[in-house]
């Protein structure tokens, strides 16, 4: 379960590099701060989806790395996740978990939104996940539609899970 939660948390931090949109450049400061996880999908069924999530905090580190922190309520348990994304030579591309996961950070064409994308192993099989992040907790239909188009283009499941937001994690409640 911890591996699954780490994979979900890790993928919440990643954003895929879209073909027509420029990738996140050397300046990781633009993505630093508080982000709300709006939606997620994957290329296969994810067994334990979060019931609710707190805002994600992204923090720029030395050398262009990023630290991400988020708390998810899954099966009545609060899971605090902290992941360091290590910058690579490719703009917008990071690795985590000693290179076992690849993360792309891509701005959405919709203002104050990013699309998160992660590729890596989960329970012995490869999985690809995408997430929609926004600065505001309110859902943007335009950003959600862009996320759907992105997911379709990447061959991900078209069943988009919209996530409940919570400022704090309370086991047994949202």
From Swiss-Prot:
It comes from the Eukaryota. Glycans are attached at residue 80. Residues 1-18 form the signal peptide. GO terms for cellular component: extracellular space. Its main location: secreted. It is found in: Secreted. InterPro entries: Calycin, Lipocalin, Lipocln_cytosolic_FA-bd_dom, von_Ebner_gland. Disulfide bonds join 78-169. Tongue epithelial tissue. PANTHER family: LIPOCALIN, LIPOCALIN 1-LIKE PROTEIN 1-RELATED. This is Major allergen Can f 1.
